[in-house]
């Protein structure tokens, strides 16, 4: 398979368990993808995919799509169904009072740990961890990666 490039608007199919799958979409700012809130065994059109609620938005390593682990199955231009890229947080592991909130361009501002509650830690996700997060969501259980990376309140 030819190397797949990051192209905003591209819809990706994520195999969840060998029987069912979810969908993600490449967003305007590399390497962010929106993962949609549906695990199914049905094939959805790109228009049906972008009509679904977004479950989460995370940056992912290129290994997820470069060699076809998450194959491209269509595209919907970003302008037709925009998805906002959320802010993320960073927290110093030795001084948990030292936090920053970052936008999708990497611009940072100081923040308190309390301001970071509800935000995801700034990290690039492996395909396997996104797939595990989807399985955990489907099984209605907490995801270890999400729990481990939550902001530490002091």
What are the roles of these predicted feature ranges?
Residues 17, 26, 36-38, 104, ...:
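Surface loops and adjacent helix of pleckstrin homology
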Residues 11, 30, 39, 153-154:
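Intrinsically disordered, charged low-complexity linkers and terminal tails
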Residues 23, 44-46, 70:
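Aromatic-residue detector
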Residues 55-154:
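Beta-strand-rich cores of mature extracytoplasmic or soluble domains
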Residues 33-57:
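Short solvent-exposed strand/turn elements
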Residues 1-32:
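Short N-terminal edge-element motif at the start of the domain
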């Amino acid at each position: 398979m030819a190397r797949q490039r990051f192209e905003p608007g591209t819809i990706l199919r994520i195999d969840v368990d060998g029987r069912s799958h979810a969908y993600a979409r490449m967003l305007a700012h590399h390497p962010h993808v929106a993962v949609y809130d549906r695990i199914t065994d049905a094939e959805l059109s790109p228009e049906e995919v972008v009509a679904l609620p977004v479950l989460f938005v995370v940056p992912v390593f290129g290994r997820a799509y470069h060699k076809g682990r998450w194959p491209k199955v269509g595209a919907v231009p970003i302008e037709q169904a925009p998805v906002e890229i959320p802010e993320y947080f960073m927290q110093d592991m030795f001084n948990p009072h030292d936090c920053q909130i970052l936008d999708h361009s990497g611009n940072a501002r100081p923040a308190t740990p309390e301001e970071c509650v509800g935000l995801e830690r700034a990290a690039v996700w492996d395909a396997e961890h996104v797939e595990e997060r989807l399985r955990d969501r489907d099984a209605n259980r907490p995801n270890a990666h999400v729990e481990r990376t939550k902001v530490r309140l002091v």
